[in-house]
């Protein structure tokens, strides 16, 4: 197979191919790093710290949202501040209600497991988080916010739904929809990029999900291929709402420095107040990656990548349509006030000529056949999950419901920090 690049129009040499592979491997590894770990790493690099943009970023002023920046957390919310969880007579779920079958994902605070409910014989994805790790990084308010956002997702087909949440003395459990078509990141790794019709379909479903969150005054803030799943039919499902910010109305802003390096909008890097349009920048970055194989301003040198995001003009190769080009230019506009979506939010995206072939009513009702079918044979088909996860043994402690727990100061602290976490749906819910 002949591969051509902008720099060399002929067949790639072995040395050039090795260089490309090295770039992609470095890119994948870096993508798996948390933002906090990345900032710590760059802060310890004396050469990187000399770069003016890095110096600017590291001099972060006092954030308005302390839970994401390792400041002292606010006192835990009182029961009256919690979302109404329905009739208190509903029984709480417990770990022993499930058969935990496979590890299918990992994160900063725990694991995601495929589990089958013993009584219902239904498969779920159960996100199990360690309270000790959450409290150590002072992220308890952040976790409660994720749970609150999940409770609002039940009415949209392209957002993962929460069925139960409960806790033991040392762990939190999110019982979620089980989605086994694989991460968009996984499919991009295998295929490198997508044809425009396929990219348009995914972008439309993603935009629909973001528009719904915005209608609830929620900004997603962490759109990236790792957080976009495909269901068994090939429709997208957004997951991981840990960086969502609630109560952001149309003209409201927030200022926390958070997100994933490759997808940070210029206003976030500048430490300026930002609004819902940060999600439309991320949509542009993901669409660009689907069409070209890498994020728009990517560099192995993170300081250089940040400088590209802030200062480098958007460069688009000629192998896309004019409508795709126009959409990318609108979404990846560095001035958020001029960005597509700044005035009428999702309606501007929806009415763009790039999506003129999309029937939005059919889209939301899943009447449009996805351009790619993951071809999973059933819930036990794990072909689209990373073997790094699925080959890992399931920890014995995850499925146990201890009859008694030694009450220590740390256990009491955890109980207070996650007050109101447990959730059982009311009888008229989506279950």
Curated annotation (Swiss-Prot):
Regulated by phosphorylation. Activated by phosphorylation on Ser-422 by mTORC2, transforming it into a substrate for PDPK1 which phosphorylates it on Thr-256. Phosphorylation on Ser-397 and Ser-401 are also essential for its activity. Phosphorylation on Ser-78 by MAPK7 is required for growth factor-induced cell cycle progression. Two specific sites, one in the kinase domain (Thr-256) and the other in the C-terminal regulatory region (Ser-422), need to be phosphorylated for its full activation. Phosphorylation at Ser-397 and Ser-401 are also essential for its activity. Activated by WNK1, WNK2, WNK3 and WNK4; which promote phosphorylation by mTORC2. This is Serine/threonine-protein kinase Sgk1. Residues 98-355 form the Protein kinase domain. GO terms for biological process: apoptotic process; cellular response to aldosterone; DNA damage response; intracellular signal transduction; long-term memory; neuron projection morphogenesis; positive regulation of transporter activity; protein phosphorylation. Isoform 2 subcellular localization at the cell membrane and resistance to proteasomal degradation is mediated by the sequences within the first 120 amino acids. The keyword ATP-binding applies. It catalyses: L-seryl-[protein] + ATP = O-phospho-L-seryl-[protein] + ADP + H(+); L-threonyl-[protein] + ATP = O-phospho-L-threonyl-[protein] + ADP + H(+). Residues 356-431 form the AGC-kinase C-terminal domain. Its EC number is 2.7.11.1. Expressed in most tissues with highest levels in the pancreas, followed by placenta, kidney and lung. Isoform 2 is strongly expressed in brain and pancreas, weaker in heart, placenta, lung, liver and skeletal muscle.
